[in-house]
Amino acid sequence: MMNESYFSYKDIYIEDGRKVLEVNMLPEKYCNFDCVFCPIGRSQHKTDVQRSFPGTDNSIVELENNINALNPDLIFINSKGEALLNDRIDDIIDLIKANGKAVRLFTNGYLLGRSEYMKIANRCDEVVGELKVLSEEDFQRLQRPIEGYTLAEYISNMAAFRRQYAGRFIFEITIIKGCSDGPGSIEKLKDIIREISPDKIIVAKINDKRFEKKFSITDERLEEISRALLDI
């Protein structure tokens, strides 16, 4: 049926003493990037314009039923692509807030510099932005963004958002072998962290088995970089 719910959920988990319900609110991958190492695969729809999807009304009803049944403390919007591209995201945030729950939004972060998307993200209690590469060449080659996007603008968009955001901004840095693990990478990353000034930093590596050999680093190197970045 075209109008069936398309939201999908992960099992409830506990994080820092809070019950978290993680929800995907896109029927397919709609994203402004097409990263070669994306665990979801290629972007079927490469866009930075909001879309309307059949079945959203039923999906929102299902979300409310799940909130009532599971009673989470936090709803984590973590979608197949860029969640901001669902044109009903405001209604979804309204529903979560009306039920007295906190909202965390995961976004790649590029759209946070645009006023219409900044306004939406500002309504969330927590926003997670991310960074994976440190050069323009790697950004274009590996993250394959929409034409005209630049790494400098990507970083400045997150920094601009953070400067005016009253909530908790979490900055997730994924270290990519050969791109952000080299000798000069730590200082570059420290400069970016200072520019964005997040409330929390998460340092991660590629864990998807399909991409580990080409893009992942050792646990030891991850620990080394994490210690350096968290000590600023």
Can you say where each PLM-predicted feature lies in the sequence?
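Short, charged low-complexity linear segments at domain edges
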Residues: 2-22
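Short acidic, glycine/proline-enriched helix-loop-strand junctions
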Residues: 171, 211-232
